[in-house]
Amino acid sequence: MFRNKLIFTTAVCATLVTLSAEDKPVSYYNDVVPVLKRSCNGCHHPGKLKGDLDLTTHAAFKKGGKHGSAFKEGDPKSSNIIEEIAGKDPSMPKEGDPLSQAEVAMFERWIAEGAKDDTPADKRNPFKIAEPPIYTSPAVISTLAYSPDGELLAISGYHETLLFKSDGSELVARLLGDSPRIESVAFSKDGKLLAVSGGAPALMGEVQIWDVQKRTLIRAMQLSSDSIYGVSFSPEGDRIACGGADKSVRLLSVTDGKELFKFDNHSDWVFGTTFSVDGKRVLSGSRDRAMKLINASNAQLIDDINKLLENVICIARHPKEDVIAYGGDMGGVRTYKMQENQGRTAANNDVNLVREYERQPAAVHAICYSPDGSLLAVAGAANEIPVYKTADGTRAGTCKGFTGAIFSLTPHPTKPLLAAGGFDGKVHQYILPTGDETNSFVPFPIKNKAVATR
């Protein structure tokens, strides 16, 4: 008797628990998202849009892909996603186990209940920070650039780009953004805009466009699921090119942020981009060893301009000519004509090679021309910066004073100065071509106070 009552009571409790769970609406954030992450996002994220479908956000999920909207609120029977995941032989996911019957039913009920997005406000953008960071030690400087008038110096920080007076005497603005890592910065030719690229490795890649005078963000574009590198402005300032860890080259409209093209001919990370003097061609440099010349109007590959010798880590175009300099992972420094490389394949010729410079003792991470193109500065894992004459390739001077690798160089537009940043977290400024150090400072507000060392 007692045993029968116990069984009856247990059964009733189980039924009540089940009914209670079914009465509770399906949560997009707590129920749907975990299944999407496990079974779907591997093929449907910004860096890999199978079927043009992105399932990483509610808005993108709702938008759907090439077959139309993924779901229709309140009507699971008319929703494409249910057709794809349900049945004895579902077409999705392509790889991995099919969703369980309970998971399919959960999707159906979520859609029937209106397919609402209940993502908490503080989780909608996991990269956003409310306040500028406080540094406890100098951060690695991955990129820096002088403004065209020479008045400002943009320096990479954590989640921000710092704008200093060019001599380092004053921090004038902190441009806070979503990207934890800032990989490249570039001013437009007129100095009115600043483009910033970066992201969160393996999670998000972004390009930001800033109004330099107002110190305000005009637009931020999350383009991929991995970091964006090598941002550059067209001569007219109406387009931006950038590379990415997703092996792509993108061309973006400055006016509206529209992606004008996505070039997928590289087979490894793309670290650098630049435009030809007339703006009609884009050149990209990649870890796949190739520098590719691309038609800027239609994204067609024109040619690989170089012989494939080593990973291309950094590139810089001559300020007045269609000549490109690159630094490689094996210490190579070479300059090439930015033109078709016809006839290279028969005898493995390097027909566009202009000059091969002194080999560096370690990988080259940064390279730049002086404003008149007469000097070429090179930096990397070796903690000094040799400066070469482009006329004959001889060394004109050497910049010293670093205690670690150097990741970025920028020439002052109106003075014979070179700024460099890297692992030691300081900006070093040198006189060209001799390499005499004239100034160094830590640009990061450590405990709310910028620390200068000289």
Predicted features and spans:
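Secretory pathway export signals and precursors
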Residues: 9, 36-39, 238
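A subset of signal/propeptide-processing and intrinsically disordered low-complexity segments
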Residues: 17-18, 26, 283, 419
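Bacterial N-terminal signal peptides that target proteins for export
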Residues: 1-10
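WD40-repeat beta-propeller superdomains and closely related acidic/aromatic-rich repeat-like regions
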Residues: 118-454
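Hydrophobic h-region of N-terminal signal peptides that target proteins for export
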Residues: 10-20
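Secreted/luminal cysteine- and crosslink-motif detector
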Residues: 14, 41-44, 315
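Aromatic- and Gly/Pro-enriched helix-to-coil junctions and flexible linker segments
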Residues: 19-152, 157-158
